[in-house]
Structure formats: C-alpha cells, structure tokens
A protein has these predicted regions:
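Short conserved active-site loop signatures built around small residues
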Residues: 2-32
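Residue-level signal for pocket-adjacent positions within structured domains
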Residues: 8-9, 28, 50-53, 203
Length: 207
C-alpha cells in the first residue's frame, strides 16, 4: 500500500492506523483481548522494558493502532486512549495541574466536567474559575500568576458558542499557560486544533 494518500477525509479515515505490521495480514487490525505477551527471547523482553508493549494494561496492538489513527487524523505528536471522554478530561487535568494551581474553564463546559472541577479538583486544592466562552482576547485580564490551563470546548457543549481560539491561544501562551480543548463536537475532520494553537485536544470518541 502506498503512503502517498490525499488529504480527502474519506481517504484519511481509510488509511489511518494501518501501518502496524503486527496484524499479520487481515485488512482490519484484529481485536486483541490478551493481557500477557510472549517474547521470542529475554533480549526482546529487555528491549521492550519501559515501553507500553509489555502488558495489556498499558494497551494492546488494537488500542495502539486506534491511537495511531487518531494521531494521523489530528496531526498530533502522540495519543492516549482512555475508557471515556470524561476520563480523558480528568487524566489530562490531573496531569497538568497541582494543588495551588488555577484553571480557567469555559462556562459552556460539559456538566460532568464542571462536576469534576467543583468536586475532585477543588478537594485537591486546584481552583477553577469559569469564563464567558465569547471572551476572546479578554481572557488575558483573567490570567493569574498561578493559571496553568485554559480549557475550551469546540464548540460549547450544550450552547454551541464558538471560542476565538487564536486569541485565547495567544493570551494563554504569552502567560505560559496551556490551551486544552474538548474537541468532541468538532472532531479532527472539522478543525485543525493544533494549527489554531491548541496544546492538548481531547475527544469523547463514542460521540
């Protein structure tokens, strides 16, 4: 199969994630349910140590193939599958924030995201402040010394506001903060998140 694919969405969807030679022939990557793996030699096992290809809890060839496809569609450097969209949001925020940090969250956010911020994050000493999703460059006035993340949704979860992403990105990056997007509605086919200045793009892929 040639790697010279066009940028047409249907072509990208068809070809993405198919470079993994571990499928041994099937057109579609097979579903791997195994948690334990065999290695041809102890040298191979040692070489794999530290990678995710040592135990099913870290992922299987099936999940890694899907991650690869999502990376290709989104133009991302790397990708991690989680059990749900909310787990992707919580994993990201817990990785980027620590006690004493400030999070600027779009007031149009998904309700379970708000519950996460007002519940678990608050108990961990992480402050969340909600901003008008139409604020644009005015977000600069809300940034504090401890603001680490500005979170947007593309588009607003229930009310569908469209954020001025380049303006938000410019303000956040000038401050040293990251811009994180819930891209569930937009999808990689609907916008180029990273070209617009997004640092981390999340999806509830089941949508």
């Amino acid at each position: 199969m040639t790697d010279d694919c066009s940028d047409h969405p249907a072509t990208r969807l068809t070809h993405s994630g198919r470079a993994d030679k571990s499928s041994y022939g099937p057109v579609n990557p097979p579903v791997v349910r195994a948690s334990t793996l065999l290695f041809a030699s102890t040298a191979d096992l040692k070489a794999a140590t530290g990678s995710r290809r040592t135990y099913g809890r870290h992922g299987t060839s099936t999940s890694m193939t899907l991650e690869q496809a999502l990376c290709e569609l989104e133009g991302a450097a790397d990708c991690l599958l989680t059990p749900s969209g909310l787990s992707a949001i919580s994993t990201t925020l817990l990785a980027l924030l620590q006690p004493g940090d400030d999070l600027l969250m779009s007031d149009a956010c998904y309700e379970p995201t708000r519950a996460l911020c007002d519940g678990l994050l608050a108990r961990l000493g992480i402050q969340t402040r909600y901003y008008d999703p139409l604020i644009g460059a005015g977000i600069a006035d809300l940034l504090q010394p401890n603001t680490r993340v500005v979170f947007i949704e593309a588009a607003g979860s229930l009310t569908f506001e469209i954020h001025d992403v380049p303006a938000l990105a410019a303000a956040a990056h000038a401050h040293g903060a990251l811009l994180v997007a819930d891209s569930t509605w937009a999808t990689p086919l609907g916008w180029d998140a990273f070209a617009l200045g997004i640092d981390v793009s999340l999806h509830a892929a089941t949508k």
